[in-house]
């Protein structure tokens, strides 16, 4: 059972001004994270000294990021930890810089694909991976005993410094994921950065690799992150690609860790498609399947994807939802590719967290390796009809038993030809529903049966 009360599936997240996302709480969170670092150094036999502790601190473009960043800096400084600030930078960029600077912690202020009224905090360790549940739980314990704890003595207070060129470092890192022998010359690509953290870097990545780049969602004003743009609104990317006669469109979300693509015919490609395309490309590598190992998806990945990988002889396994759980299973199995339909794709020989720009580059690389268009590669697998829905926890007290009974009935009816998933969200007070079936109408009816069962009351 998950004992964490502040952290969810992707850090701490909430409405700005709420108990979990106020300057007061963020100061406490930063102080607790700083004490967590000091504890770890003590255990490792290298206690901190003046100026020895520092963290990378990045953010997206939300208006609240300015105040929460200041609160985070103040909290860290008061317990002797310096903050190296990147300014707006995609989450995978902060993960990369944490490793590159050999620092013990990276921090991102972002609520990912959520609207500007939300914000969040997530932490990365020295290896660029998100902290484990146990590490997050320890930080929570330190938050709860924070009141009354003394500040560091004046001589050991931390500093705040800007990292010059953080964005350019990240651009070069992304470009290194694309072979030097290949170029994007001749391609016109629409890049949609969701008015978020990637607004100043995503376009540069593709332009500097030779593409003719047109920008969408690259005019942040603090309030328009994910507002009708980005990976959560692919219909606008598709429209822009068609209107501009572009070859492809690449949409990332507000913090740049997920990606969706569109082609010149208006076809959209989600994370499931990208997993298949990238895997097909990697099977052409010198060591092929031996190097790839297998592919990790989540419980939300379409059944058709699993069937397609089976035909290729590629092992496939499912994790829980969230790129942290995907990565955990990848590492456990020693596999190099994983992701989820929402667009989080982890290519482990390139980066150890989801990265929207790198995922798109890997898909474009697969095109060149296979000598096929994205459409042709993705057409090699077929989706099983799927319907999704949800209900609010506030509307359905004691829903578990009612939904369990209906779930068992549906699974018995579908047998091996479909799938039923009931999953409480890790970031919102809702329960998500998924039914896959041979026909869409059957899937839709299944979701409605589950929803009505939940709302039926006692």
What is each model feature region?
Residues 10, 57, 94, 107, ...:
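Buried hydrophobic positions in well-ordered alpha/beta secondary-structure cores of metabolic enzymes
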Residues 93, 137-172, 264-341, 346:
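Proline/glycine-rich low-complexity loops and linkers
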Residues 246-248, 286-458:
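Phosphate-binding and adjacent anionic-ligand microenvironments
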Residues 39-48, 53-118, 204-262:
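N-terminal small/polar loop signature for handling phosphorylated ligands or for N-terminal nucleophile
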Residues 1-2, 119-244:
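Gly/Ser/Thr-enriched, mixed-charge loops and adjacent short helices
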Residues 1-74, 78-79, 105, 159-187, ...:
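An N-terminal, well-structured beta->alpha segment
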